[in-house]
Amino acid sequence: MRQTTIVNREKANKKWFVVDAENQVVGRLAAFVASVLRGKTKPTFTPNADMGDYVIIINAEKAIFTAKKEEDKVYYHHSGYPGGLKSITAAKLRAKKPTAIVEKAIYGMLPHTKLGNKQRRNLFVVAGSEHKYAAQKPERLEVR
């Protein structure tokens, strides 16, 4: 008789991966990375435990949008005060903080729970090709 193995976070074999975002479409990149962060690429996926791997995204400022989304896409946030709805286009956001577009896309694809917050901490987005996580010996990961 087969037994179902339940893997908890202590038994999770977490790896480090580095993903190059250069010339990658933001949405496709975000969907793939969110899947790796959640651990859905592993055969031992458990939905209620942090099973995902660590992901470093380099060249985040070189991720692309399709069509005219660079000028047309608008990001909104609210200050909490009446009339406090703020908006910024993708082009202005990229100029202000190059990593924010990729971070926001991935964060939106992760669960909005305590577990999702833990999984967000496993993501490291870097503008440029150099990162400070070489000591972890990350493996290269291609976006499917």
Curated annotation (Swiss-Prot):
The keyword Ribonucleoprotein applies. Gene3D superfamilies: Ribosomal protein L13 (3.90.1180.10). Keywords: Ribonucleoprotein, Ribosomal protein. Belongs to the universal ribosomal protein uL13 family. This protein is one of the early assembly proteins of the 50S ribosomal subunit, although it is not seen to bind rRNA by itself. It is important during the early stages of 50S assembly. HAMAP family: Ribosomal_uL13. PANTHER family: LARGE RIBOSOMAL SUBUNIT PROTEIN UL13M (PTHR11545:SF2), RIBOSOMAL PROTEIN L13 (PTHR11545). NCBIfam families: rplM_bact (TIGR01066). This is Large ribosomal subunit protein uL13. It comes from Mycoplasmopsis agalactiae (strain NCTC 10123 / CIP 59.7 / PG2) (Mycoplasma agalactiae). The gene is rplM.
